[in-house]
Every structure is written in structure tokens, then in C-alpha cells.
Curated annotation (Swiss-Prot):
Its cofactor is Mg(2+). It comes from Proteus mirabilis (strain HI4320). This is Uracil phosphoribosyltransferase. Transmembrane segments: none annotated. GO terms for molecular function: GTP binding; magnesium ion binding; uracil phosphoribosyltransferase activity.
Length: 208
């Protein structure tokens, strides 16, 4: 599995601000979107382009356009919604697919409860977004769902990832690509990433 920890100074600075225990919901939400936008830039660096001719102000001009597969953004409810706008800033024409998977706080197992995928999902590249890759259960369940629906081109964008989650994802889906702002130390006994961001969903939605 391709694993990319993006060490760009802008990303690391913004992520550092997000780790502040006293950060406001508004600021956390803004930074989540900003980091997501920067991760998208990295994750789409290998998209193929083609040369087309358009009519410019002084006559015909050749420009580069993205070619090939169309893109769908796949936020995992609910925290993934906090990353969606950051991706769409760079790819405004992307279709949105929504998957609902929550983690049972006692068993730490994923529980799927909702899906609404973009049309022709089998023809699209999926950018799956979720702030935290902790145990990997929710992400694996989402990718299972996408693959069962015919999607074969999948990239994962997360703000922070735990080694345990990376290992589980790689074992389940070695063909996907993972882009993260940070590979953190470990999971604690409650399944939270250390140092992590706390509960990203609560911080994005203001439901502490």
C-alpha cells in the first residue's frame, strides 16, 4: 500500500494548531478544511492531463485539462463532512458519495448504517475522507462497500493516522493509497489516537 505522510510546513503548522485542547469549534472546522485542501493537492498530483485547444482572448490557445476517470468525494459520516469542502475547493466538479459508518465505543467495531453513492461509481476515482484513521475499522468497511459497488480506484485522505489503523488498512486493502498529515504514536486503551486530535467529530460539529 502506498503511504504518504505529507510533511509540508503549511500542513504541519495547521495540524499543530488543531491539536490545541482549547481550540474553538469554528477554528478547528476551518483548519480541517484547509488541511484537507492541501492533502488533496498531494493526492491528485498523479492525475493524467490532456492538451486541448480553446479560444483565448488572442485566438486559439492550448491548455492542460485533467483527463480520465471522474472523481467522487466520499466523506464517512459524520466527521468526514468536515473535510469535504476542502477537497471540493480543488475539485468543484467532483460528485459526492456519502457513507455512514460509526464505531461502537465498547467493541470498537464498525457499524454501517447508510450509503448513497454517486452514479457510475465503477468509473470514478474515490477520495475517501475521514479525519482519523484509528483502528481502521470504519475505513475498511467503507472501502469494502465501494469495492462491492464496482469502484476500483480508491485513495484515502485522513488528517492523522495511528500505526495500528495503517496496518489494518494495508492488510485489508493493499491496493489503496493513503495520504495523511501525520502518522501519530499509537492508540490508547479506548481506541483514540495519541497524541491525535481528540474527538474530531465533536470538535467539528460542536457536540462535546
Amino acid at each position: 500500500m502506498k503511504i504518504v505522510e505529507v510533511k509540508h510546513p503549511l500542513i504541519q503548522h495547521k495540524l499543530g494548531l488543531m491539536r490545541d485542547h482549547d481550540i474553538s469549534t469554528k477554528r478547528f472546522r476551518e483548519l480541517a478544511s484547509e488541511v484537507s485542501s492541501l492533502l488533496t493537492y498531494e493526492a491528485t498530483a498523479d492525475l493524467e492531463t490532456e492538451t486541448v485547444t480553446i479560444e483565448g482572448w488572442c485566438g486559439p490557445v492550448e491548455i492542460e485539462q485533467i483527463k480520465g476517470k471522474k472523481i467522487t468525494v466520499v466523506p464517512i459520516l459524520r466527521a468526514g463532512l468536515g473535510m469535504m469542502d476542502g477537497v471540493l475547493e480543488n475539485i468543484p466538479s467532483a460528485r459526492i458519495s456519502v457513507v455512514g459508518v460509526y464505531r461502537d465505543e465498547e467493541t470498537l467495531k464498525p457499524v454501517p448504517y447508510f450509503q448513497k453513492l454517486a452514479s457510475h461509481i465503477e468509473e470514478r476515482m474515490a477520495l475517501v475522507v475521514d479525519p482519523m484513521l484509528a483502528t481502521g475499522g470504519s475505513m475498511i468497511a467503507t472501502i469494502d462497500l465501494l469495492k462491492n459497488s464496482g469502484c476500483t480506484s480508491i485513495k484515502v485522505l485522513v488528517l492523522v493516522a495511528a500505526p495500528e489503523g495503517i496496518k489494518a488498512l494495508e492488510e485489508a486493502h493493499p491496493d489503496v493509497e493513503l495520504y495523511t498529515a501525520s502518522i501519530d504514536k499509537h492508540l490508547n486503551e479506548h481506541g483514540y489516537i495519541v497524541p491525535g486530535l481528540g474527538d474530531a467529530g465533536d470538535k467539528i460539529f460542536g457536540t462535546k
